[in-house]
From Swiss-Prot:
Name of protein: Dihydrolipoyllysine-residue acetyltransferase component of pyruvate dehydrogenase complex
EC nos: 2.3.1.12
Family: Belongs to the 2-oxoacid dehydrogenase family.
Cofactor needs: (R)-lipoate
Domain called Lipoyl-binding: residue spans: 2-78
The Peripheral subunit-binding (PSBD) domain, residue ranges: 133-170
Cited function: The pyruvate dehydrogenase complex catalyzes the overall conversion of pyruvate to acetyl-CoA and CO(2). It contains multiple copies of three enzymatic components: pyruvate dehydrogenase (E1), dihydrolipoamide acetyltransferase (E2) and lipoamide dehydrogenase (E3).
Keyword Glycosyltransferase (UniProt): no
């Protein structure tokens, strides 16, 4: 008997998703555990594994389809030796939960305005109503070149004018070379927004419109941190996979500071403020389609080596679109680090419903005054963005002071555990 493949629910709140890509085609043999498709939710693109064994007999929902309801019939498997003759009847009987064709968006297409192949023939008319057959690109080049296109003889099928005809037209090549070298005929390209980009836009717009942000900045001397990091990494020898990053120390310092200042580990609710009992830290990670924030849970209870290893694993999964909902949903505080891009400081946008996000800038050598003497130190800028409904200025300042103490004296946070 044919086996139904249904649109899976990849999180408790998921009601629909996009079928981004089929990794198998009709006629392919499927084994349990094989990845057969990629489903795009409002948070991430996730792989779907087969549960049953069989042959992919019919793909019902094509790749690129959007807004496919959960539990819709997306494909059908048949068992070994089973005939295809009754497959259409089976689909007709079992496709009642599937969305109607008009309810599912067509696969997203890449739109490139004015970037039309020369084979696409269009008809143009001049002021004297003389019909001219030319490709859109040829017409645009003729306009840039300031040449009357009806004066150009076409060499394409049925006498149509193509790009090369415009380029080789007498008096045209020189003018064109002077004008088009520094300007692309296609003014722009359009990239359809995927679900990840849409949800980022929605949440950040909501944050800036509804959350009263305020910002606190501080400078941290990271010379001791860099020294102790170097000593730790030397102990790993040539094992680069075990190396501790500056960001690992930042995560641990934030965790210890939240342990000391729990009022910064909170979120706003209309009826009550939630003060979190666990220190779960979201870390912003750039991916091809946008941004995700995997979570280090109970970060205050972990040593620097374990925390670093866990963070590396989460980053790898994030960039491979393999994070599970439990690994990126929740969290009480976010860290966004742009220091590796040379950004000195920035004001990050709060990730609702959290009340705080800390933007970390680059480290650089600067002159400082110490004991009335000018000396050189490695300084890192950090900026706390906080929700003033939850975090008062004094609480934000207290948190940054605790963070600064841990980051400037890293031995404290390496020893300071519950």
């Amino acid at each position: 008997m044919p086996i139904k493949l249904l649109m899976p629910a990849l999180s408790p709140t998921m009601t629909e998703g996009n079928l981004a890509r089929w990794l198998k085609k009709e006629g392919d043999k499927i084994n349990p555990g094989e990845v057969i498709a990629e489903i795009e939710t409002d948070k991430a693109t996730m792989e779907v594994e087969a549960v049953d064994e069989g042959t992919l007999a019919k793909i019902i929902i094509p790749q690129g389809s959007q807004n496919v309801p959960v539990n819709s019939l997306i494909a059908v498997l048949i068992e070994e030796g089973e005939e295809l003759s009754g497959i259409e009847e089976f689909i007709a009987k079992n496709n009642s939960n599937s969305p109607k064709k008009e309810e599912i968006s067509k696969p997203a297409e890449t739109i490139a305005p004015q970037n039309v192949k020369e084979e696409n023939i269009t008809t143009a008319s001049d002021q004297n109503n003389i019909k001219v057959f030319a490709s859109p690109l040829a017409k645009r080049l003729a306009k840039i070149q300031n040449v009357r296109i009806e004066e150009i003889k076409g060499s394409g099928p049925h006498g149509r004018i193509i790009k090369q005809d415009v380029l080789s037209h007498k008096g045209g090549s020189k003018a064109l070379s002077n004008k088009i070298v520094s300007r692309n005929p296609e003014e722009y390209r359009l990239a359809p927004n995927n679900n990840i980009r849409k949800i980022i836009a929605k949440r950040l717009l909501e944050s800036k419109q509804t959350v009263p942000h305020f910002y606190l900045s501080i400078e941290c001397n990271v010379d001791k941190l860099l020294d102790i990091r170097e000593d730790i990494n030397k102990s790993f020898g040539d094992d680069k996979s075990a190396k501790i990053s500056v960001n690992d120390f930042i995560i641990l310092a934030v965790a210890k500071a939240l342990q000391e200042v729990p009022n910064a580990n909170a979120s706003w609710g209309d009826d009550a403020i939630r003060y979190y009992n666990n220190v779960d830290i979201s870390v912003a990670v750039a991916i091809e389609n946008g941004l995700v924030t995997p979570i280090i849970r109970n970060a205050d209870q972990k040593n620097i080596v374990d925390l670093s290893s866990e963070m590396k694993g989460l980053i790898k999964k994030a960039r491979e679109n393999k994070l599970t909902p439990e690994e990126f949903q929740g969290g009480g505080f976010t860290i966004s680090n742009l220091g590796m891009y040379g950004i000195k400081n920035f004001n990050a946008i709060i990730n609702p419903p959290q009340s705080c996000i800390m933007g970390v800038g680059s480290s650089s050598k600067r002159a400082i005054v110490k004991n009335d003497q000018i000396s050189i130190a490695t300084i890192m800028d950090v900026t706390l963005s906080a929700d003033h409904r939850v975090v008062d200025g004094a609480v934000g300042a207290e948190f940054l002071a605790a963070f600064k103490r841990f980051i400037e004296s890293p031995a404290l946070m390496l020893l300071y555990t519950r």
